[in-house]
Amino acid sequence: MSQLLEKAKDFVVDKVANIKKPEASVSDVDLKHVSRECVEYGAKVSVSNPYSHSIPICEISYNFRSAGRGIASGTIPDPGSLKASDTTMLDVPVKVPYNILVSLVKDIGADWDIDYELELGLTIDLPIVGNFTIPLSQKGEIKLPTLSDIF
């Protein structure tokens, strides 16, 4: 009897491990909006859904770092669903207050940009498997807004 249960367990584990899962990538991080309080950047995330039905996204969590310091983090609850058998583009807004940017003066230096690392966690609700988080990471540099961008 225990051999039968062990075989059944191995079968289920093998099938669950080989289930197709959505794949995601960060395609771009750009300046989105400048206000008097903060600079808002937008991360464009491309997510492909291999299933023939839409899948709900539970949440998107993000951590925006520069010079080894966290400069913005947050969670976007219930951002929508992934389209069935298609690629969905998600826009993740990241708001960075000016006082944080001022503290990064050494990194900004002469080239007027921020070297960043963006870590995203895209949590989706897969049938049978349950909540599944796709970890994403993107490194790059973003130009800071000039006075002409603000006014």
Swiss-Prot record:
Top-level division of the source organism's lineage: Eukaryota
Keywords assigned: Stress response
Keyword Flavoprotein: no
Protein encoded by which gene: LEA14-A
SUPFAM superfamilies: LEA14-like
Keyword NAD among UniProt keywords: no
The protein, known as: Late embryogenesis abundant protein Lea14-A
Organism annotation: Gossypium hirsutum (Upland cotton)
Induction: By water stress; in leaves.
Stated family: Belongs to the LEA type 2 family.
GO terms (BP aspect): response to desiccation
